Amino acid sequence: ELKMNIPYKFENTQEALEKLCKLISNFTKKAGINPEKVLNICINISGRVNPESGYSFSMFNFSELPLAEVLAKKIGYSVCIDNDTRAMTYGEYMQGCVKGEKNIIFVNISWGLGIGIIIDGKVYTGKSGFSGEFGHVNVFDNEILCHCGKKGCLETEASGSALHRILLERINNGECSILSSRIATKEDPLTLDEIIAAVNQEDLLCIEIVEEIGQKVGKQIAGLINLFNPELVIIGGTLSLTGDYITQPIKTSVRKYSLN
């Protein structure tokens, strides 16, 4: 078993796609596996992905060919693709905290916001593989433009990208944080990992924003519970690394707004 934590800037550019293929090729070489024994490489990316057709409709859609086919030609192996949150959901179902439950919702709170759904032990993909775009439910009456091109999406006020934006706005408006001096230097862009670290160092401003995000996400999770009646809801993704700072507000909102 070989695991590698590789720095990679995930952007919707041809250069980023080429970089990804190079990283995967290097990884397969370092793994020292006989190429003839590699049956398939599964690549999980964010956005709208149809795992059956191999098309990605949000990222790396520069060719008329399916992204899976483009990647296979560049890497030299058979490739399948899927949405990252759905893959995380399946991972939890097979090897994670699931203990026999067959109806599950996995909430991925990272830079974006998505969910994976398992119904009767099967991952639900929807007709075109676009299920789980939780972050793009229209919730807020705001003028914040989401990266999807629409306004009012849940993700605009309840996600890692929202945390990043709100924190910068509040620090620039004079509020204090242990990240204030870091932002004032204006060197490299502030990362989500740095904000998570500040939360876990008990930075009050960062904690306050995370708790507000937890309340908003929890209210919408309550709606999902009312719709799907799952046996288990799992909170994952980058923001879950803040622990109780995000999970407790989520639980409070779920208790307040859900029927079960």
Tell what function each PLM region has.
Residues 83-85, 129, 212:
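Short beta->alpha linker loops
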Residues 53-54, 121, 129, 174:
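Detector for glycine-centered tight turns/loop "hinges" at secondary-structure junctions
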Residues 3-103, 245-255:
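Glycine-rich phosphate-binding loop and adjoining helix at the ATP-binding site
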Residues 98-158:
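Glycine-rich phosphate-binding loop of actin/hexokinase-like ATP-binding domains
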